[in-house]
């Protein structure tokens, strides 16, 4: 369902407001953190694709993220040919998290990764993909340190 097709109910607003309050308490303490969401899809167009919508990520950083994710997948025993990695702004995506970027938490963060994982990665290959994603997420800190060390004046993600 597209974001503009969703029906917003008073109960949904109440739950979201409560969630956003907790989010604010955590995120506002350290806005240098990456915000990460993991979702799943079963869309036929993305059967063998891991799509990553982003916030605050330029093309150079997206290339680094894609490379680090491929390395993490390989380390977890997943063939690079098993999955097509699509990441904004380098690739077009089916799932762009547009509603979340417009009205959700992604609207309020400096940097974010919103992952849409295909069904087989969440079911048949769950242990391998879980290990790969954990390794990838741990590597985000080293990416930040590398960017900080290269250019202390940099304001890019």
Across the structure, where does each feature detected by a protein language model lie?
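N-terminal catalytic or cofactor-binding beta/alpha core of small enzyme domains
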Residues: 1-157
């Amino acid at each position: 369902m597209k974001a503009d097709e969703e029906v917003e109910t008073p109960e949904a607003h109440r739950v979201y407001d409560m969630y956003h309050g907790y989010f604010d308490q955590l995120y506002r303490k350290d806005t240098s953190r990456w915000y990460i969401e993991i979702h799943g899809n079963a869309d036929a167009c993305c059967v063998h694709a891991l799509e990553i919508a982003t916030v605050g990520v330029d093309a150079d950083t997206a290339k680094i993220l894609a490379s680090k994710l491929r390395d993490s997948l390989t380390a977890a025993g997943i063939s690079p040919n098993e999955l097509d990695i699509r990441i904004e702004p380098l690739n077009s995506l089916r799932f762009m998290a547009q509603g979340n970027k417009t009205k959700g938490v992604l609207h309020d963060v400096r940097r974010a990764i919103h992952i849409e994982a295909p069904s087989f990665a969440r079911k048949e290959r769950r242990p391998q993909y879980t290990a790969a994603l954990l390794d990838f997420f741990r590597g985000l800190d080293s990416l930040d340190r590398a960017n900080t060390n290269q250019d202390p004046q940099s304001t890019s993600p």
